[in-house]
Amino acid sequence: QKSVNNTFYRKMETPKANAIISWFNHKMPYSVDNAIKADVTGQILSMIYLKKIREEASAAYTVGAQGVFSKSDDGFQIGQIVAYCPIKPEKKDIGLKIIDDEIAKLSTTCESEMLDKIQKLLLKQFDDRTKTNGYWSSLVMNNYVMGLDNHTAYKDVVSKLTPMDISKFVKDYLSSSNKVSIIMLPKE
């Protein structure tokens, strides 16, 4: 696992810090299963980071995360889990520590209540999306160009996810990912 940290300073009228932490993985293969697990991982991390960074540490007004897996028509595939946080400069160290600590914790344990909430949301969003032309147009194009079927097994995969599935995914994902940290701090 490689890690790159780009911390830089910028003169600002209103001092603030921004952190973007991204874990890239091009070794784990693209699949509907991995794409769903990456999405769920990002949503769980968003919930955790909001609670720990915003509510408990008061280190940021907002914070979020997202996970995606994508494949292009030339066969290139990549996963990305990203945490982003406009953070209070004086609390950047604690915020960044929470980001790292909590993704590591997720690789060993996942709260079932969070997973249940996200599963219900994903299934509802899926049903809503299937009522739009854009959804079906994108599905046909992805199937034609790349041979992907992100529709048929979606509900089944989402419904059957367990906390252990998410933790194993995160553990496997992190073991072969590269981490990039981009941190902007105010210049005195």
Residue ranges, per PLM feature:
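His/Glu-based metal-binding/catalytic segments typifying zinc-dependent metallopeptidases
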Residues: 1-48, 52
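Generic recognition of flexible, low-complexity loop/linker segments
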Residues: 7-9, 51-52, 67-69, 154-156, ...
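M16 family metallopeptidases and their MPP-like homologs
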Residues: 16-28, 54-108, 112-160, 179-186
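Short, intrinsically disordered, mixed-charge
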Residues: 42-46, 50, 54-58, 101, ...
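Amphipathic alpha-helical protein-protein interaction surfaces
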Residues: 46-49, 111, 166
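Bilobed periplasmic-binding protein-like "clamshell/Venus-flytrap" ligand-binding domains
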Residues: 167-185
